[in-house]
Amino acid sequence: MDGREYWDRQAATYDRATAWLEPRLLAPARQWVAQRVRGRTLDVAVGTGANLSYLRSRADELVVTDQSEAMLARARDRAAAQGLAITAVQADAARLPWPDAHFDTVVCTLALCCVPDEVAVLAEMRRVTRPGGLVLVADHVESSTVLGRAVQRGLDVLGRRHGEHHRRRPLLRLGQAGLVPVEHDSSRYRLVERVAAQHAS
């Protein structure tokens, strides 16, 4: 089963599956990202659209993309329920269909853990962000605790079939994608890390 098929199957139950984590761990990361959004904004790997309620008051124009059409359908429904105008485009995060420097802000939350090549996606995010714009990332990353890392190693084994990686650290890969961090922080025990970055040159 490829990634697109897997996420198509997960779309109907994803929000229920993450309902416990959402207010405790995920929503604070979404809020941190949204507070830094400005201008024309792209949400990469939007999933079911959980970011939309946070982004709606910050972005002048909101474009969303996901490889999964089923996930995009959920995001469209959520936007419609909120009276929010979005442009939704099915696309591979590593091959975004927009020209260079097209967006003021590009966002990816809780999805770099699920892509085959996180550096390729970060590089694409950089490419479509204008110089001086922001690339904003939030994701679950390698924990700062021994117990946390042990649990994550087990989750990596379980998630191998559908390409989940619980111990990546996008912050440490920014340079390979032509980005430099301008701000970052993390949740308790570094379960989720939040990063704002700009073009390195």
Task: Give the predicted meaning of each segment.
Residues 1-12:
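N-terminal, positively charged/glycine-rich alpha-helical extensions of SAM-dependent methyltransferases
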Residues 17-21, 136-194:
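C-terminal alpha-helical "lid/dimerization" subdomain adjacent to the S-adenosyl-L-methionine
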Residues 20-40:
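Conserved alpha-helix/loop element of class I SAM-dependent methyltransferases that forms part
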Residues 42-95:
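Class I SAM-dependent methyltransferase SAM/SAH-binding core
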Residues 94-106:
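A short acidic, Gly/Pro-enriched loop at the edge of an enzyme's catalytic core
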Residues 105-117:
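A short SAM/SAH-binding and catalytic strip from SAM-dependent methyltransferases
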Residues 119-131:
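A short glycine-rich, Lys/Arg-flanked "PGG" loop and its adjoining helix->strand segment in the class I
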Residues 195-201:
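C-terminal lobe and adjacent flexible extensions of AdoMet/dcAdoMet transferase-like proteins
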